[in-house]
Regions:
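Conserved PLP-enzyme active-site core in the AAT-like
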Residues: 1-161, 166
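Conserved C-terminal alpha-helix-loop-beta "cap" of PLP-dependent enzymes
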Residues: 162-249, 253
């Protein structure tokens, strides 16, 4: 946002809480854009509060609803003007096409559609078929994503190798109360932080069911390390300011049997711990006794 919009003379300011959004509004402000839950820390914002703030100030409000999906969250009913989705993810659900979607007020959609048509943003017929196929099972898939992610988050929260779990469905999540008010389910995305960040790569290569990959929202479970992938272009200081540390791992929880998923995480975390321990021992200088 900062690097692209500023090239066109559009200023950007950042906020996290409703009070910070109020304070950030100036006479030049035209639009409020939020992501809830956010990537990769799964933070949630008060959508109803921001929707009302936008109406009072005469601002367009936009939310990225990709992580939640329409099954779990309805921002238009909470006062937002435009809802965005990466249709590549949960809406399609099969990891075999690319598209995006904007849903909202008729006048705004007319303008967006006209611009999209002028710039060539139209899906081909086969991609439309793939999207329609995915939408037919969206509600069914999301129920399983929700259930599996809830169970996996609870397991990880109790694991000794894990320092923190970020999932809005957990009572200890900082935005659990907000998420409970505005979400019908807490989604299939979570992230967790290892106590020892040096174990990240050892854990990553030990999975048998889960696939190390950057995408999300498909039938299969995927895991990635944001510091090495989505946020790799940021400096370590910039990542730390966002709460993205080297030991953070993001999971797109699929619809596999939950017992298989939990077993895979249990094995990978233990194998990663053993591998890291062996590496530390082998790196110690040898001693010779006479």
């Amino acid at each position: 946002v900062s690097s692209d919009l500023t090239r066109f003379g559009i200023g950007v300011s950042y906020a996290r809480s409703l009070d910070e959004f109020r304070a950030a509004i100036t006479p030049r402000t035209r639009l409020i854009y939020v992501e809830s839950p956010s990537n990769p820390l799964l933070r949630c914002v008060d959508l109803a509060g921001i929707g009302e703030l936008g109406r009072r100030q005469g601002l367009v409000t936009v939310v990225d609803n990709t992580f939640a999906t329409p099954v779990n969250q309805s921002p238009l009913q909470l006062g937002f003007d435009i809802v965005l989705h990466s249709g590549t993810k949960y809406l399609n659900g099969h990891s075999d096409m690319n598209c995006g979607a904007a849903i909202g007020l008729a006048e705004l959609m007319r303008r967006i559609r006209e611009t999209a048509m002028n710039l060539g943003g139209s899906l081909d017929a086969h991609a439309c078929y793939q999207m329609e196929r995915g939408l037919k099972t969206l509600a069914l898939r999301m129920r399983q994503h929700n259930a599996n992610a809830t169970a996996l988050a609870a397991f990880l929260q109790e694991h000794p190798a894990v320092a923190q779990v970020n999932y809005p469905g957990l009572p200890g999540h900082p935005d659990h109360a907000v998420a409970s008010r505005q979400m019908r389910g807490f989604g299939g995305m979570l992230s967790f932080e290892l106590r020892d960040p040096r174990q990240v790569n050892q854990v990553l290569c030990r999975f048998q069911v889960v696939t190390p990959a950057l995408s999300l929202g498909g039938l299969e479970s995927l895991i990635c390390v944001p510091a090495q992938t989505s946020h790799v272009k940021l400096s370590a200081t910039e990542r730390a300011s966002l709460g993205i540390r080297d030991g953070l791992m993001r999971v797109s929880v699929g619809i596999e049997a939950v017992e298989d998923l939990i077993g895979d995480f249990s094995s990978a975390l233990e194998a990663g711990r053993r591998s890291a321990t062996q590496k530390r021992r082998s790196s110690r200088p040898a001693t010779v006794r006479k």
